[in-house]
Amino acid sequence: MNRPKLEPVQDVKQRRDAALAQLVGSIPYIRHLGVNFDRRGDELTANMPFSESLIGNPFLPAIHGGATGAFLEITALMELMWSIVWEQMENGGPAAEAIERGKFPAMPKTIDFTVDYLRTGLPRDAYARARVNRSGRRFASVHVEAWQDNKTKIFAQATGHFLMPDLSI
């Protein structure tokens, strides 16, 4: 009985972290907003560090709704892409090798994205986590929630529908 040789866990983690960093780095708007992602297994948590440039209403002050909406959409798209990349990396083969070289599948295209602003986004760091509700060959549905100090006090949530690309690399 021949079993495939298992890689050390640290090598697998480093390869996944490198792939995530390349994926995030390939999108200029993510860099513009300063959004970064923390990976724990296959789960991503997005972080948008506070910046004065994010303030939309200086009298409150409050984070601009456009920045909040963009943060939610970025988080949803990255979760959807990461679920695709994760699966391809786990399956191995040519797709996994292409990802290691920095070649990713095309990004899904947004069909619609509905944001619910539940409370004021305060002038502090924001966090978000998305969940892929359904991902098929042609269509995907993703829900995302954002919070600041307390994960139970969501300040915005969104649901997005995406047109899935051809997943071949």
Question: Each predicted region: which residue ranges?
Answer:
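Hydrophobic residues in beta-strands and at strand termini
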Residues: M48-F50, Y117, M164
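Hydrophobic beta-strand-centered segment that forms part of the acyl-chain substrate-binding groove
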Residues: L77-Y127, V132
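Catalytic strand-loop segment that frames the active site of acyl-thioester-processing enzymes
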Residues: L33-I63
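Short Pro/Gly-enriched beta-strand edge/turn motifs at strand-loop
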Residues: R15-Q22, D112, A126
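Active-site-proximal helix-loop elements at catalytic-domain edges
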Residues: A18-N36
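A generic structural signal for short beta-strands and their flanking turns/coil linkers
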Residues: L33, D42-L44, K109-F113, R124, ...
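HotDog/MaoC-like acyl-thioester-processing domains
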Residues: N2-Q14, M78-M81, R119-I169
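Compact, glycine-rich, soluble single-domain proteins
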Residues: F59-M78
